[in-house]
């Protein structure tokens, strides 16, 4: 009798352990669909979004903070013309996560992040494609110095391109005070390096990729696509096959003195760009 009870106890413990292991999968599979009226807190609390690692704090650095934004709806948080596309994209992020896709990838190595913690925020968010040729696009949103476009043009455009069958990556790069030594352009270069080095894993071809940039992201894509010393050649990667820039800063020279006076005085060095760009 004792032997039988022991076997029952062991069986119960094993079942309990299996149940615990399956909880994250079960939780992600029971993720809710998002709408324009979903709040930021509801989005961030969703199991699939949590598991995905997708960055959703795109306006909190503007001074209003988490408490102000967390109960705002996606309609209030996102740009009016992009709300529907961005909401659909977040539903796609959740769906991909439920299907076992690793959405978030760190661009810099753990050793590099340990040496410079600001590098930890540099991430790629992946939307796997279906096209047989494996062409991919890298979307680089704007940032307005204190807020990023990851939940606006970044994800909205990525989802639309993904609908067309392309593999798409959205780049989250350093902004505000973490952009010394021309950090954002370095982040873009390293992101392309990362995709190139992991092309087989992502099922993409390393050549003939497209860069799609908006605002400051458009400026970065333009600089990277050039043959200058700060362009793609500096990172030993193929030249972009296509360059699409939306409302970019084409010539930074006009606003460089103002930017330098506002952002750089305490650092005693150029921050967002090289002095000869």
List PLM regions with ranges.
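N-terminal cap/lid segment of alpha/beta-hydrolase-fold proteins
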Residues: 58, 64-132
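Short beta-strand element of the alpha/beta-hydrolase
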Residues: 134-142
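A fold-wide structural signal in alpha/beta-hydrolase
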Residues: 136, 162-169
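Catalytic nucleophile-loop/oxyanion-hole region of alpha/beta-hydrolase
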Residues: 149-156, 171-206
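Short beta-to-alpha linker loops that shape the active-site pocket of alpha/beta-hydrolase fold enzymes
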Residues: 143, 172-176, 249
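C-terminal segment of classical bacterial N-terminal signal peptides
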Residues: 18-25
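Serine-hydrolase catalytic core
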Residues: 269-277
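Primarily recognizes the serine-hydrolase "nucleophile elbow" in alpha/beta-hydrolase
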Residues: 190-261
